[in-house]
């Protein structure tokens, strides 16, 4: 899985991605007429430099038990993606995750576009294999609020309790909490949760659910035991 480390001679590598989306409209494509970049295999970052030769043996290293959970944050906003509005919710989520011990691998600012959101959810869950994806925005009744539908379309298992808990908590603050259509699902070992768009609502909801997420994420990843309490 992503995060696995290998040694080869003096070099130390960490897997960062499995497979790669073809960037069919990149500069290479424009010049060559086709993509010549690799699309298969695994990709790794160099943790410690060294020399690798053809035929060298790659040694799989034990995964440390204390590795931080890995997260990604996606802000959905037409105006934000066009530079017409500052994204305040995304950075707030990053701050709260980091303070709780998560490693935020990526932050994205997208328009309310179903195709773009689906592409990124699939990439982050399947190729990057992050443990948690938090989206913000697009959970209301407006015509372009498509976040829950896209989230459900990539789901392999439902995890409704998280979204239900957020609605319950929001209703203790405002009756408008019932208008949230946020979804929470699992794709593989990745938990995907839709948060509201406003910074105030993001803070209220994330403070409420964040203490319980890590255990669920670790269960999904096969890192923790059962949920039963003695």
Across the structure, where does each feature detected by a protein language model lie?
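Proline/glycine-rich low-complexity loops and linkers
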Residues: 147-230
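Metal-cofactor-dependent catalytic cores
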Residues: 1-67
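Glycine-rich phosphate/diphosphate-binding loop of Rossmann-like nucleotide-binding domains
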Residues: 66-112
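SAM-dependent methyltransferases
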Residues: 61-71, 96-99, 129, 217, ...
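Short beta-strand segments
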Residues: 74-75, 135-136, 194-196
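N-terminal small/polar loop signature for handling phosphorylated ligands or for N-terminal nucleophile
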Residues: 96-98, 103-135, 140-155
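Short, solvent-exposed amphipathic alpha-helical segments in soluble enzyme
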Residues: 23, 88-91, 207-212
């Amino acid at each position: 899985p992503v995060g696995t480390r290998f040694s080869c001679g003096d070099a130390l590598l960490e897997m960062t991605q499995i497979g790669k989306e073809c960037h069919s409209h990149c500069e290479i494509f424009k010049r060559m007429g086709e993509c010549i970049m690799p699309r298969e295999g695994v990709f790794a970052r160099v943790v410690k430099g060294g020399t690798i030769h053809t035929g060298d043996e790659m040694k799989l290293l034990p995964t440390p038990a204390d590795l931080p959970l890995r997260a990604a944050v996606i802000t959905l906003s037409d105006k934000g993606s066009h530079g017409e509005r500052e994204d305040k919710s995304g950075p707030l989520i990053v701050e709260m995750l980091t303070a709780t011990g998560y490693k935020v691998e990526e932050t994205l600012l997208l328009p309310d576009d179903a195709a773009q959101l689906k592409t990124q959810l699939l990439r982050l869950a399947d190729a990057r294999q992050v443990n948690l994806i938090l989206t913000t925005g697009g959970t209301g009744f407006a015509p372009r609020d498509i976040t829950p539908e896209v989230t459900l379309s990539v789901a392999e298992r439902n995890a409704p309790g998280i979204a239900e808990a957020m609605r319950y908590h929001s209703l203790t603050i405002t009756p408008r909490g019932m208008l949230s259509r946020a979804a929470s699902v699992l794709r593989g070992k990745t938990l995907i949760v839709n948060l509201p768009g406003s910074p105030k609502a993001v803070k209220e909801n994330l403070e409420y659910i964040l203490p319980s997420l890590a255990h669920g994420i670790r269960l999904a990843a096969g890192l923790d035991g059962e949920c039963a309490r003695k």
